[in-house]
Amino acid sequence: MSEQIVTPESSTPVVPNKEAKINLLDLNRQQMREFFKNLGEKPFRADQVMKWMYHYCCDNFDEMTDINKVLRGKLKEVAEIRAPEVVEEQRSSDGTIKWAIAVGDQRVETVYIPEDDRATLCVSSQVGCALECKFCSTAQQGFNRNLRVSEIIGQVWRAAKIVGAAKVTGQRPITNVVMMGMGEPLLNLTNVVPAMEIMLDDFGFGLSKRRVTLSTSGVVPALDKLGDMIDVALAISLHAPNDTIRDEIVPINKKYNIETFLGAVRRYLEKSNANQGRVTIEYVMLDHVNDGTEHAHQLAELLKETPCKINLIPWNPFPGAPYGRSSNSRIDRFSKVLMSYGFTTIVRKTRGDDIDAACGQLAGDVIDRTKRTLRKRMQGEVIDIKAI
């Protein structure tokens, strides 16, 4: 695992400036109100504009009919609503859609998963990933940069625009958001938290905090910070029943071991209402690596002090990976052991694997990792991950 990451970008300025238009997708509601105040307008104008932006997926000020023409003219001079564009779309036979979304000169991937009673969007937080988990395709691409707020919430906006805005169709285009796409969300708190605030805001997408899930591999100091910043559902990428295996497949474990990680999880649960007292454990099933019945018993003992439900994830292959997918029989035996201890255990249904949209398969378009250090020096201060 790389010991260094690029620092998150500084907060977006909210002072109107004709020389550099502000992308309103970069602003949460508090920042939007400050922006309108600095524009000489009443704060409620921010709520009006946000409603147009997120309820109607409107990016044209002239279409905001309850806003006077003078203000619309002002907004066109100093602001814009610019979501990242879809440059490629792939549709799976099971209804899953994967969009390649342009962020600058690179791409990230966003996945839309429709079901009978919900529609889930899997959102990326970084271009690439620094954590180098051995079973994940994204990690093999290396890390390039953090996404801005507008590039994170813009994925939700763009998907809602394509599927159909709530005020247009009469129903929510997206009911759940999972921060489980490309990147480690906790290494981009500066931008991930405001984006999630917009997802939850009634003038944003208005999602329940129980329907916005952040998944982390275990950046413990940032997880402790998260608990003081926002309350959303938490999923943890555990994937191993002991430190020996986790050190190998999830290298950040060498810095923050399982005991330290689970301690931070329990602290988050104490502060959270969204999780209703328990966390979701994600456990990818790797053939003869972490999927034996002895591993299941170890996992049950490990988690006995952590209220949780367990999602077993059949591993999704990618070229050059050194692993195999566990057989259905091994997954079934593993699941039965966990249930014998009283754990709620679910085997996740694989969706979108025929278009490389399943868990662990997102790759996007990341510049060759051999240039990582040079890129970091060019893009901003390089800091030690311990500082996060």
Swiss-Prot record:
Its cofactor is [4Fe-4S] cluster. Residues 115-354 form the Radical SAM core domain. Keywords: 4Fe-4S, Cytoplasm, Disulfide bond, Iron, Iron-sulfur, Metal-binding, Methyltransferase, rRNA processing, S-adenosyl-L-methionine, Transferase, tRNA processing. It catalyses: adenosine(2503) in 23S rRNA + 2 reduced [2Fe-2S]-[ferredoxin] + 2 S-adenosyl-L-methionine = 2-methyladenosine(2503) in 23S rRNA + 5'-deoxyadenosine + L-methionine + 2 oxidized [2Fe-2S]-[ferredoxin] + S-adenosyl-L-homocysteine; adenosine(37) in tRNA + 2 reduced [2Fe-2S]-[ferredoxin] + 2 S-adenosyl-L-methionine = 2-methyladenosine(37) in tRNA + 5'-deoxyadenosine + L-methionine + 2 oxidized [2Fe-2S]-[ferredoxin] + S-adenosyl-L-homocysteine. The keyword Electron transport does not apply. One of its GO terms (cellular component) is cytoplasm. The active site is at E109, C359. [4Fe-4S] cluster binds at C129, C133, C136. S-adenosyl-L-methionine binds at G183, E184, S215, S237, L238, H239, N316. It is found in: Cytoplasm. GO terms for biological process: rRNA base methylation; tRNA methylation. It is an enzyme of class 2 (transferase). One of its GO terms (molecular function) is rRNA binding. Its EC number is 2.1.1.192. Binds 1 [4Fe-4S] cluster. The cluster is coordinated with 3 cysteines and an exchangeable S-adenosyl-L-methionine. Disulfide bonds join C122-C359. PANTHER family: 23S RRNA METHYLTRANSFERASE, RADICAL SAM CORE DOMAIN-CONTAINING PROTEIN. Reaction proceeds by a ping-pong mechanism involving intermediate methylation of a conserved cysteine residue. NCBIfam families: PRK11194.1 (NF008396), rRNA_mod_RlmN (TIGR00048). Belongs to the radical SAM superfamily. RlmN family. HAMAP family: RNA_methyltr_RlmN. Specifically methylates position 2 of adenine 2503 in 23S rRNA and position 2 of adenine 37 in tRNAs. m2A2503 modification seems to play a crucial role in the proofreading step occurring at the peptidyl transferase center and thus would serve to optimize ribosomal fidelity. This is Dual-specificity RNA methyltransferase RlmN. It comes from Salmonella agona (strain SL483).
